[in-house]
């Protein structure tokens, strides 16, 4: 296996919160419903959502930042162990297939008012 692409992104949590509050329906355009909710059905916290948004941006960068990708075609989910994972479908899966991506690695963090994500596409 070799690295096909690496993406990194950061999101200021308060700015991300303001964007969601200012733009009704934005969360639904960025995230699948299961990304918005915790396993117990409660709404996920803003820092966690900001990190997931950063991951989606990082995915696009790892794929060469092509246009035409849909936010909801890159889903960030978490294993029971707490390890973040990436599931791609539609436009993102098509671009990944073009490049020969076979696996993804994702790391999320949020601290001091900033959320960040690193994504590695491997093929």
Swiss-Prot record:
Reactions this protein catalyses: apo-[ACP] + CoA = holo-[ACP] + adenosine 3',5'-bisphosphate + H(+)
The organism's place on the tree of life at top rank: Bacteria
Enzyme Commission number: 2.7.8.7
Q: Look up the record and name the cofactor or cofactors this protein needs.
A: Mg(2+)
Is the keyword Cytoplasm assigned to this protein? yes
The subcellular location is: Cytoplasm
Q: HAMAP family given for it?
A: AcpS (MF_00101)
Q: Which NCBIfam families match?
A: acpS (TIGR00516), pantethn_trn (TIGR00556), PRK00070.3-2 (NF000832)
The protein's name is Holo-[acyl-carrier-protein] synthase
- State the organism of origin: Streptomyces avermitilis (strain ATCC 31267 / DSM 46492 / JCM 5070 / NBRC 14893 / NCIMB 12804 / NRRL 8165 / MA-4680)
Gene that this sequence comes from: acpS
């Amino acid at each position: 296996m070799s690295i096909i692409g690496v993406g990194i992104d950061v999101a200021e949590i308060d700015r991300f919160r303001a964007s969601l509050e200012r733009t009704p329906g934005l969360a639904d355009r960025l995230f699948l419903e299961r990304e918005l909710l915790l396993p117990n059905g409660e709404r996920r916290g803003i820092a966690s959502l900001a990190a997931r948004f950063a991951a989606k941006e990082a995915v696009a960068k790892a794929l060469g930042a092509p246009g035409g990708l849909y936010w909801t075609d890159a889903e960030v989910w978490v294993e029971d162990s707490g390890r973040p994972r990436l599931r791609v479908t539609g436009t993102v899966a098509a671009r990944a297939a073009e490049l020969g991506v076979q696996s993804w690695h994702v790391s999320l963090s949020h601290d001091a008012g900033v959320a960040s994500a690193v994504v590695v596409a491997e093929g």
